[in-house]
Curated annotation (Swiss-Prot):
Residues 27-796 are lumenal. Signal peptide: none annotated. It catalyses: N(4)-{beta-D-GlcNAc-(1->2)-alpha-D-Man-(1->3)-[alpha-D-Man-(1->3)-[alpha-D-Man-(1->6)]-alpha-D-Man-(1->6)]-beta-D-Man-(1->4)-beta-D-GlcNAc-(1->4)-beta-D-GlcNAc}-L-asparaginyl-[protein] + 2 H2O = 2 alpha-D-mannopyranose + an N(4)-{beta-D-GlcNAc-(1->2)-alpha-D-Man-(1->3)-[alpha-D-Man-(1->6)]-beta-D-Man-(1->4)-beta-D-GlcNAc-(1->4)-beta-D-GlcNAc}-L-asparaginyl-[protein]. This is Alpha-mannosidase 2x. Its EC number is 3.2.1.114. It comes from Mus musculus (Mouse). Belongs to the glycosyl hydrolase 38 family.
Length: 1152
């Protein structure tokens, strides 16, 4: 009844507009001054104009009448079938394009002004060191520095330590890559297990010995294979401080390409394992090998309750500058932080590497002589041709003096008289002889030094935390507090160069196929975690937990660990040997399939009308998977739904916490299909043929695209029936432009295709928000015009190719060393274009030799319709030392500034620096990059991590793939020749600035920037598409299904449910508690936010968790540290929580 009223009102409104238009026109003619001058006689031209306009009005009235009739017919049919929400009804407008009537519902809830204050900033003190400013001010001149080639000569007076002894901590460590030259398992078998076995026996020989370990993935594998006796010994070594687990993540993650979901997840997995098995809680971070450092990591470590951290791979010029200004140790603060709550103490290692020659002091020739693995007769030696000597009574005085000189020089670079000296390298201490050589010789040196009061030195073995504790004690502060006089720093340490102009910016793109697969696995893991947690909570509440497959928890655990393993700094980076990449790929695919099973099992339980009838049968799953991959390096193939006389059902999962209106595309085997909602209403669908190439249709496969409104984190149900063409089945129209290429185009009688041989002029596709223009010759995007603006905005896509240098040093897996600026991509033959238009989406597909591009525009209200969906299927397997790039040219006046995200967590402003080579101006882009001026912002959202830059005014440029034939001398020993056909997916969002132009807050704008709410949602729409799960065909009647609405009320727009993750009782079974991890996003209110189709608002960071989940009670709630090791407050009866902008908060939660 309510729907009838709405339609009647809508139709009446259209009729009124038409009549009023006619009245105005007649009125204008009546008051025409020319008419009065002519004594009331109409000129013939006026009469013909009036006649034309009356005819147009009659046509419009007729169209409106037709629309209203169709709506009435639809309403009658709908109300005859069922009650429920109205369907979207598209119609043709006078100019032949499609339009969709707006839904009779609020399209936007306003944002509270208080929630806009955060992005304006201006609070708190500015840090002394802002990395953007440091980079602008540094000359990057690479002056020869003597024995410390990238530094300077260091001098001291022997009296410098008369008042306070130099305290030296030598920290033995072994850096174990979970895959690089060898696979994870091969490293474990051949090296890592021997390191850890020797550690247990060798540390127990002398309580003064210490050892540092970081990678829990290896440690957990070893733990599973050792005796109870050895486990007890390990616990004792941890308890007495001889063995320290630093950071405690599953791996030492890459900080450029990894998404913050995965960074948090691998940290939780490691910390939970340590707590459960060792009772250990990490205190200090240790990141010696990631290729550049993100400011997201110090935030995560601080929120996990770590107090200190160490980093190593920072641009050599920055290291030199910080060494000269005694700034190598600092409080690292987040850019938005106004009260120092995010501060963490950070130590930056000053020299070239973390190996022994570069850690005792500035002279590697001397330091190498104190790496006792290199004693004569061993397998490795010192490149400086002076070998180590075993320490004896006869030489200890000379050798100790030589080493002390290095210690003293190194200590002059720091503000305290406490010195850190790491002692280790990759896979060190794998043989008992090395343990003996290092520990015996160093102990003799320490004993000698410590026996001489005149040296004013105390040297000993130590752990990283012992070093930090001694520093805090010396400076008179509590652990983690800011020592007096130490600087505060904000910003990040990208991009990294280790020497000359060798910038490690290639790995931002290397092996993009696996960077994409990583994010697919991540989205599936989050979706599976949430659905499993909800299904288990409902099953337990209903007393049905015994029937539910709790064993799925083992699959979740394995997937967590697979995703964690792939965050390793030689995995997601694309910098491992080919065989190791295959091993990672096989693991990723296995976990992806497992997660689809977990999702299917949870969705099955949650959509059943009668859950008492649920039974788990692994042999015959209730739901099919949405897609499948024939191998780890193949693109997915979507499941085709076979229609016959009986209805088929489809369950659609929305992994977003917000309700979404999206076009869901299904593949079916018949063009004659009717789609019904859960309530039995027919839904309008756009039907298209399915193409296998530019001109070939796939026989008997059709794409059905239906707009569906899905509940947040919920499950929708659709019914498919075979049907003759009805009013709800709307065909796409297709044009193919051959551009003179001799090709035959597939044809089907049911789907006419218009073929244009040549001479195509520019053309456009459009929706309610914009008109998008393309070149008729190239098929590439040219411009965008918003419907409410006269002016077109330049938005030109160009493909480019980079070569590599002809000199000895060439690009490889790590390095980007281009031979010159990029050259335009020149195709061997003109492209074939295919334009598809229909009621719910229109798209332009362009086929070139090395890529094919599909740019799609959704004709929907809200988030989906406000950006361009772009995908590029890239195949450069015939390239030799070339890289393919996409450049976007705009008329935005960006003035050399652009913005890239760090780990999908925060935005970092960047400045194009002309003094640096081209490759230095590239940065990681895991999620988005944007340019802006005082009027507009253009954001490129990405579904996979790639390298990005802005090399010219108004430009954004992204490297899509790279094929390189040689090693770049960083240890890998291979080029990048295993390229795959890769699909890179993007969203292009153009926004208009409505308030607060960047100049108003210029200082603040330099150091911080935030996406809009629309941009945040667009990013999530791209990275978490709906999952389409067909109900498997079975004998007999299908059980009744219902949609699943888990949230009783919408989450605030700026809240992101990062994860709802069951905690382990053990590796294979869940506990009763789960971890709820929420992130409140910072956003810029100054970009247009009217009628954008959000069904949410903001709430000043407040959320009532107790009433959030429909049908479930929160029976226990406790705020904890990020990884749940530390309770932050007692469990409370109140379930109301509050988050500050940008903060991630974790809660121990019990649902029942």
């Amino acid at each position: 009844m309510k729907l009838k009223k709405q339609v009647t009102v809508c139709g009446a409104a259209i009729f009124c507009v038409a009549v009023f238009s006619l009245y105005l026109m007649l009125d204008r003619v009546q008051h025409d001054p020319a008419r009065h001058q002519n004594g009331g006689n109409f000129p013939r031209s006026q009469i013909s104009v009036l006649q034309n306009r009356i005819e147009q009005l009659e046509q419009l009235l007729e169209e409106n009448h037709d629309i209203i009739s169709r709506i009435k017919d639809s309403v009658l049919e709908l109300t005859a079938n069922a009650e429920g929400p109205p369907a979207l009804l598209p119609y043709h407008t006078a100019n032949g394009s499609w339009a969709v009537l707006p839904e009779p519902r609020p399209s936007f809830f306003s944002v509270s002004p208080q929630d806009c204050q955060f992005a304006l900033g201006g609070r708190g003190q500015k840090p002394e060191l802002q990395m953007l400013t440091v980079s602008e001010d540094l000359p990057f001149d690479n002056v020869e520095g003597g024995v410390w080639r990238q530094g300077f000569d260091i001098s001291y007076s022997p009296n410098d330590w008369d008042t306070e002894d130099l305290q030296v901590f030598v920290v033995p460590h072994s850096h174990n890559d979970p895959g690089w030259i060898k696979t994870f398992d091969k490293y474990y078998t051949e090296q890592t297990q021997h390191i850890l076995n020797s550690m247990v026996s060798k540390l127990q020989e002398d309580p003064r010995r210490r050892f540092l370990w970081a990678e829990v993935s290896f440690f957990a594998k070893w733990w599973d294979n050792i005796s109870a006796q050895k486990r007890a010994a390990v616990r004792r070594l941890v308890g007495n401080g001889q063995l320290e687990i630093a950071t405690g993540g599953w791996v030492m993650p890459d900080e450029a390409n990894s998404h913050y979901f995965a960074l948090v997840d691998q940290l939780i997995e490691g910390h939970q394992w340590l707590e459960r098995n060792l009772g250990a809680t990490p205190r200090s971070g240790w990141a010696v090998d990631p290729f550049g450092h993100s400011s997201t990591m110090p935030y995560l470590l601080r929120r996990a309750n770590l107090t200190s951290m160490l980093i190593q791979r920072v641009h050599y010029a920055i290291k030199k500058h910080f060494a000269a200004t005694h700034s190598l140790e600092f409080m690292w603060r987040q850019m938005w932080d106004s009260d120092s709550s995010t501060d963490i103490f950070c130590h930056m290692m000053p020299f070239y590497s973390y190996d022994v020659p570069h850690t005792c002091g500035p002279d590697p020739k001397i330091c190498c002589q104190f790496d006792f693995k290199r004693l004569p007769g061993g397998r490795i030696n010192c490149p400086w041709k002076v070998p180590p000597r075993a320490i004896t009574e006869a030489n200890v005085a000379d050798r100790a003096a030589l080493l002390l000189d290095q210690y003293r020089k190194k200590s002059r670079l720091f503000r305290s008289n406490v010195l850190l000296v790491p002692l280790g390298d990759d896979f060190r201490y794998d043989k008992p002889q090395e343990w003996d050589a290092q520990f015996f010789n160093y102990q003799r040196l320490f004993d000698f030094l410590n026996s001489k009061p005149e040296f004013h030195v105390q040297a000993q073995f130590g752990t990283l935390s012992e070093y930090f504790d001694a520093l805090y004690k010396r400076t008179g502060v509590e652990p983690g507090a800011r020592p007096p006089g130490f600087p505060v720093l904000s910003g990040d340490f990208f991009s990294y160069a280790d020497r000359e102009d060798h910038y490690w910016t290639g790995y931002y793109t290397s092996r993009p196929f696996y960077k994409s697969l990583d994010r697919v696995l991540e989205a599936h893991l989050r979706g599976a975690e949430i659905l499993y947690s909800l299904a288990l909570a409902h099953a337990r509440r209903s007393g049905l937990a015994g029937q539910y497959p709790l064993s799925d928890f083992a699959l979740l655990t394995e997937a967590r660990r697979t995703l964690g393993l792939f965050q390793h700094h030689d995995a997601i980076t694309g910098t491992a040997k080919e065989a190791v990449v295959v091993d990672y790929g096989v693991r990723l695919l296995r976990s992806l399939v497992s997660l689809k099973q977990v999702i299917i099992n949870a969705a099955h339980y949650l959509v059943l009308g009668d859950q008492e009838t649920y039974s788990f049968d692994p042999g015959t799953p209730f739901l099919q998977m949405d897609d499948s991959r024939v191998s780890h390096d193949a693109l997915p193939e979507r499941t085709v739904i076979r229609l016959d006389s009986s209805p088929r059902f489809v369950v659609v999962f929305n992994p977003l916490e917000q309700e979404r209106l999206s076009v869901v595309s299904l593949l079916v085997n018949s063009p004659r299909v009717r789609v019904l909602s859960e309530e039995g209403q027919p839904l309008s669908v756009q039907i298209s043929v399915h193409w296998s190439s530019a001109t070939d249709m796939v026989p008997d496969v059709y794409q059905v695209s239906v707009p569906v409104r899905l509940p947040g984190l919920g499950l929708g149900v659709l019914q498919l029936q075979p049907d003759l063409d009805g009013p709800y089945t709307l065909q796409s129209s297709v044009r193919v432009y051959l551009n003179g290429v001799k090709l035959s185009v597939s044809r089907q009688s049911a789907f006419p295709v218009r073929v244009v041989d040549s001479g195509a002029s520019d053309f456009a596709i459009s929706n309610r928000y914009m008109q998008v223009w393309f070149s008729g010759l190239t098929g590439l995007l040219k411009s965008i015009r918003r419907v409410d603006e006269e002016q077109e905005q330049q938005m030109e896509l160009e493909f480019l190719v980079y070569g590599t240098r002809t000199s000895k040093d060439k690009s490889g897996a790590y390095l980007f060393l281009p031979d010159s600026e990029a050259k335009p991509y020149v195709p061997k033959k003109p492209p074939v274009l295919r334009v598809t238009e229909g009621p719910f989406f229109s798209e332009v597909a362009v086929y070139y030799e090395h890529f094919h591009q599909v740019i799609r525009l959704y004709n929907l209200p809200g988030v989906e319709g406000l950006s361009l969906d772009m995908s590029f299927q890239v195949d450069i397997r015939d390239y030799v030392n070339k890289e393919l790039a996409l450049r976007i040219h705009t008329d935005i006046d960006s003035q050399g500034t652009f913005f890239t995200d760090l780990n999908g967590f925060q935005i970092q402003p960047r400045q194009y620096l002309k003094k640096l080579p081209l490759q230095a101006n590239f940065y990681p882009m895991p999620v988005m990059a944007y340019i802006q001026d005082s009027q507009r912002r253009l954001t490129l959202h990405t579904a996979q991590a790639l390298g990005v830059s802005s090399l010219g005014n108004g430009q954004l440029e992204v490297i899509l793939d790279r094929r390189l034939m040689q090693d770049d001398n960083r240890g890998l020993g291979q080029g990048l020749k295993d390229n795959k056909i890769t699909c890179n997916r993007f969203r292009l969002l153009l926004e208009r600035r409505t308030t607060m132009s960047p100049e108003v807050h210029q200082e603040q704008e330099r150091s911080t920037s935030y996406p809009s709410l629309l941009s945040h949602l667009t990013s999530m729409y791209l990275s978490t598409p709906p999952l389409v799960l067909p109900v498997a065909k079975r004998q007999g009647t299908s059980p009744a299904l219902r949609s699943f609405h888990p949230l009783a009320s919408p989450l605030p727009c700026d809240f992101h449910l990062l994860n709802l993750r069951m905690l382990p009782a053990e590796d294979t079974l869940p506990a009763t508690d789960s971890a709820l991890i929420l992130h409140r996003k910072g956003f810029d209110c100054g970009l247009e936010a009217k009628n954008l189709g959000f069904n949410c608002t903001t709430s000043q960071g407040k959320l009532a968790l107790g009433s959030l989940f429909h049908g479930l009670d929160v029976t226990f709630l406790q705020p904890t540290s990020l990884t749940l090791l530390y309770p932050l407050a007692s469990p409370s009866n109140s379930t109301d929580i509050s988050l500050e902008p940008m903060e991630i908060s974790t809660f121990r939660l019990r649902l029942g």
